[in-house]
Amino acid sequence: MKKIGLFGGTFDPPHNGHLLMANEVRFQVGLDEIWFIPNHKPPHKTDRKRADSRHRVKMVEAAIESNPHFRLELIEMEREGPSYTVDTVELLKKRHPEDEFFFMIGADMVEYLPKWHRIDDLLQMITFIGMKRPGYTGSTTYSLLFADVPAFDVSSTLIRQRIMQEKPVDYLLPKAVERYIKEHHLYES
């Protein structure tokens, strides 16, 4: 039986903060692997245009290729419609009944858990790991594991803005992702 951390996100683009969080959680919780799951259509993000799904998948591939403990899981890309975590977890548990799954969420999402689609069902299926971040209490009535992740103040939004403003993004995202963004002219104004 493997212990697998599920890390869902738009990854638009994936950055060094994502990799740092995944690596720290894997180490602190004793997970065998982290599966990065790009969202097809995140239900909580409907207000902006994202990079095309195929570009986001290619960027995640580029970001994680050097870490043997990281894997790309396309389960949410295979489905149409909103990407609800409960549907993803149900399907993964059917496909991999021998494995134990953990779902990684940022401290900002811990406070949002009561609003998650079918949260009570989800809590019966999986253990959540809250990644502590400065500025968020991470307070909840739910039973969660917590991981202390070093502060690395970067976001995909910041990176997209810097690219649009033609500012450098060195050290914010993996070089392979930066090359991919430049080759495909993503996020340019």
Swiss-Prot record:
Catalytic reaction equation(s): nicotinate beta-D-ribonucleotide + ATP + H(+) = deamido-NAD(+) + diphosphate
EC number of this enzyme: 2.7.7.18
SS bonds (residue pairs): none
Pathway: Cofactor biosynthesis; NAD(+) biosynthesis; deamido-NAD(+) from nicotinate D-ribonucleotide: step 1/1
Tree of life domain: Bacteria
GO molecular function: ATP binding; nicotinate-nucleotide adenylyltransferase activity
GO biological process, one term: NAD biosynthetic process
Protein family according to the UniProt entry: Belongs to the NadD family.
HAMAP family xref list: NaMN_adenylyltr
Role of this protein: Catalyzes the reversible adenylation of nicotinate mononucleotide (NaMN) to nicotinic acid adenine dinucleotide (NaAD).
Protein name as catalogued: Probable nicotinate-nucleotide adenylyltransferase
Gene: nadD
